[in-house]
Regions:
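Active-site neighborhoods and metal-handling regions in enzymes and metal-associated proteins
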Residues: 1-150
Length: 150
């Protein structure tokens, strides 16, 4: 908002600037172009690549342990969508660089799997059995990067 009374030069991408903000800059000289840092941020250096590899390997370890637990126990012990989601979170918490989920885990069984961005609640949580489809979309935030696994 402070720019509305300025006579400065402003670089903006009109594809990502809403009408209100664009019009607040009427006294400014506007240069329409892409953000020059976008390409620089898209190219990872060797250290960033190494960190991303490490976090994906570690997340893969947590996912493998989780999948083993799930396959070994589904249909043998009581489990619900929320219990399964919680168990996956516990596996990730065992990892040294784990900081938390990168987004809320979607654990959707049978009909719930067809609902986009479904989130299990106390009311909607259902028992999971050794039949039908179980969709899990989850991710972890690690010191070296972020994962997203479906």
């Amino acid at each position: 908002a402070f720019l509305k009374d300025q006579h400065e030069t402003v670089l903006l991408n009109p594809d990502f600037t809403n009408y209100l903000h664009y019009n607040l800059l009427f006294k400014c000289k506007i240069i329409e172009d892409k953000n020059p840092t976008e390409l620089m941020k898209a190219i990872k250096n060797d250290i960033q690549i190494d960190h991303l590899k490490a976090c994906h390997i570690n997340d893969g370890i947590a996912m493998t342990k989780f999948m083993y637990w799930l396959k070994k126990n589904v249909g043998k012990i009581p489990m619900t969508e929320r219990m399964i989601s919680d168990h996956l979170e516990e596996e990730r918490k065992k990892l040294p660089d784990y900081m938390g989920p990168s987004f809320e885990t979607i654990c959707a069984y049978k009909d719930h799997a067809a609902m986009m961005h479904y989130q299990s609640t106390e009311e909607s949580d259902v028992d999971v059995k050794a039949e039908g489809m179980l969709l899990i979309d989850s991710g972890g935030q690690y010191y070296g990067g972020t994962t997203d696994v479906t």
